[in-house]
Amino acid sequence: MQAITFSRPATFALLLAVLAGCATPQTRMPTVDSAAMQEETRKQREMVVEDYMNSYRRLQAVASRIVTSGTELCADKMGPYYGLTAWSREDFGKEWHDIVQSRFGVSDVASISSVAPGSAADQAGVKAGDVVLSVNGWTPPAGKDAVDKLMEKLVQEGKFGMPLELIVRRGAEEVRISMMPGQACDFRVRLSPDDVKNAYADGQNIVIYKGMMDFFRTDEEVALVVSHELAHNAMKHIDAKKTNAMVGGLVGLLLDVAAAAGGVNTNGDFMRLGSNMGAGVYSVAFEQEADYVGLYFMANAGYKIDDAASFWRRMATTNSRAITMKSSHPTTPERFIAIETTVEEIRQKLGSGQPLKPELKNAGSAVAREEVQAIPH
């Protein structure tokens, strides 16, 4: 039997004929003007940027209280602090450059993005939107590294404990500002624009995702997660994870060498396996410690800690596996009980007037026992 074949033009024509017979809307709808559509698109994009900026400022205001009140828990990881942050249009994707500059005045020169209430910058009169022209006679560069260079300069000058002389452009005028630095835990707090419920610490930074900011219902919840990640950094968990990974890798390397001596080429498989296993050692304990120390950071900043366990319970409902998974995080029931115990411990210390410091295995250092890595939540 001869196979039936269809030419492409004939098939396309048949498809169009079938589609033409499909049901259509029954009302006469308004036509959409292309110019109006472009304007609406721009408005919505402006709203996206504004929402990000508001989340950023909220995050920085909460974080400022925590890093300035928790200096005793940061041991040797403290630095000068002014209570200001900066951004330039390079901190936004290229597709947003036009909007952030034309609508919000953020150019390729660093400008002040937030000023923490009560901070040195706030008391000196620094305002969000100020464009930084000079720092003790030094002119900040423009472009990709504008913000990093500015923040590095502020830290460098602050280490001398001398007044910081700023010249900023505010509107059409130049304003001179003088201020002295305070002290804070020396970790930068950043907001990732990604729309996921996540946060992590990397030993130098605390990164909160925009999706997590949208998930927070109260500033106490913001403080809880920031404090948890700060605890990872303060307890040097990232360094500990790296050390454990190195030890595991060395053990694996010895196995690779032994296998090679027996005529087996493992291609370094044991070293990689050992490194991964080493990095995972104490991961659950490190998370528990970050919960524990983090609540002390939070309480020292004056935030209410009563609902801490309830927040992690709500987080668990978005990831049901977390209720039983214990590979790198404590299970939710276990976490809830441990957090409630810590909350009661802190309540008792507050009631008796004791210092709000974690109970350490070794009382030698301010807060430095075992140490771990940034683990997303």
Question: What are these language model-derived features?
Answer:
Residues 120, 207-224, 280:
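Short pre-active-site segment immediately N-terminal to the catalytic Zn-binding motif
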Residues 149-190:
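PDZ-domain C-terminal substructure recognizer with occasional recognition of PDZ-binding tails
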Residues 53-110, 178-180, 186, 190-191, ...:
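PDZ/PDZ-like peptide-tail recognition elements
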Residues 18-21:
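C-terminal motif of bacterial Sec signal peptides marking the signal peptidase cleavage site
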Residues 291, 304-306, 310-377:
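Extracytoplasmic and endomembrane cell-envelope/extracellular-matrix remodeling and assembly machinery
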Residues 121-146:
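Conserved PDZ fold ligand-binding element
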Residues 212, 217-221, 230-246, 303:
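Catalytic Zn2+-binding segment of zinc metalloproteases
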Residues 26-80, 169-172, 263-324, 328:
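Short helix/loop segments within enzyme catalytic domains
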